[in-house]
């Protein structure tokens, strides 16, 4: 594990995944994942919102949860934040209309790196001769998605073992497995390739993106001789911001990063577990010729989970 500033522990994805998998096998998520219920923190901007620290124990080290990930493929379109961009994007691609984004942008990751074979409807997974649905093998599963899926289980387990007042609250899922019940088409149908999302927070004071975003296509050498990357910028040299992020992070771009998952959030919406990007490195590469996720999930469907995310 990597230590930053001597006070922040960032767990490696491999170590965290192994610890969570072992805890699940032993039916003992408490050995890895815990919530500090005794130290509720009240949000500065909204006193009805409270936070509880998330701790994990990996290889004997206990710390608030932050972890790194590598080589994960973002899928789908980040909606624009301005009406002008909505008009432009819909004119360029009228088949897949977008709406103006009214919340923080998110990175999206599928469970499988490749799509399961689908029927002509683009949603139903094909079956083999035995009548079993055909899914990609374990080697095609996203490591980050596996971690998030296990964190969801550990989170729900910890809430059920927590104070009685918490057990009756709505627990907001980390993974979207179905199309929105309010969708005009295919409402409540299972997604063939479930989605997990990482929030890219916008600082409410500065209105700028909170995480540092770097461009892996543009390496630089630091004064200490180590390699880093230039900050992510658009064609005009403007750094990544809420108004241009949808242009800079395209579907099928590859991401490394650090996720801040140090707190759960308790609000009138229920209990959520915000996963926020602390730092990201983006590598854009040529899009493949496979099925575009936007042809499977409409803009309303892929933003359904974000509508539920509590204030973080």
From Swiss-Prot:
GO cellular component, one term: virion component
Compartment(s) of residence: Virion
Keyword entries, A-Z: Early protein, Virion
Main location: virion
Induction comment from the UniProt entry of this chain: Expressed in the early phase of the viral replicative cycle.
Family of this protein: Belongs to the asfivirus CP312R family.
Protein name, per record: Uncharacterized protein CP312R
Lineage summary: Viruses, Varidnaviria, Bamfordvirae, Nucleocytoviricota, Pokkesviricetes
């Amino acid at each position: 594990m990597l230590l930053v500033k001597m006070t922040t522990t960032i767990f490696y994805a491999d170590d965290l995944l192994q610890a969570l998998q072992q805890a699940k096998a032993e039916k003992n998520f408490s050995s890895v994942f815990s919530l500090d219920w005794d130290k509720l923190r009240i949000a500065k901007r909204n006193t009805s919102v409270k936070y509880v620290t998330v701790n994990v124990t990996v290889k004997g080290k206990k710390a608030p949860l932050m972890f790194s990930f590598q080589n994960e493929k973002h899928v789908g379109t980040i909606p624009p934040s301005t009406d002008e961009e909505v008009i432009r994007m819909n004119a360029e691609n009228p088949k897949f209309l977008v709406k103006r984004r009214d919340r923080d942008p998110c990175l999206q990751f599928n469970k499988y790196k490749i799509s399961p074979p689908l029927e002509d409807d683009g949603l139903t997974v094909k079956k083999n001769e035995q009548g079993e649905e055909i899914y990609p093998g374990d080697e095609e599963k996203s490591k980050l998605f596996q971690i998030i899926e296990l964190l969801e289980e550990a989170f729900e387990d910890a809430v059920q073992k927590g104070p009685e007042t918490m057990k009756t609250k709505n627990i907001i899922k980390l993974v979207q497995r179905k199309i929105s019940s309010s969708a005009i088409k295919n409402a409540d149908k299972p997604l063939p390739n479930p989605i997990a999302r990482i929030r890219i927070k916008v600082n409410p004071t500065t209105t700028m993106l909170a995480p540092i975003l770097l461009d892996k296509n543009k390496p630089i050498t630091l004064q200490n001789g180590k390699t880093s990357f230039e900050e992510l910028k658009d064609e005009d040299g403007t750094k990544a911001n809420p108004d241009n992020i949808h242009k800079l992070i395209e579907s099928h771009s590859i991401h490394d990063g650090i996720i801040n998952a140090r707190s759960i959030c308790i609000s009138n919406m229920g209990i959520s577990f915000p996963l926020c990007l602390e730092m990201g490195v983006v590598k854009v590469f040529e899009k493949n010729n496979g099925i575009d996720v936007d042809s499977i999930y409409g803009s309303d469907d892929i933003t359904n989970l974000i509508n539920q995310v509590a204030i973080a």
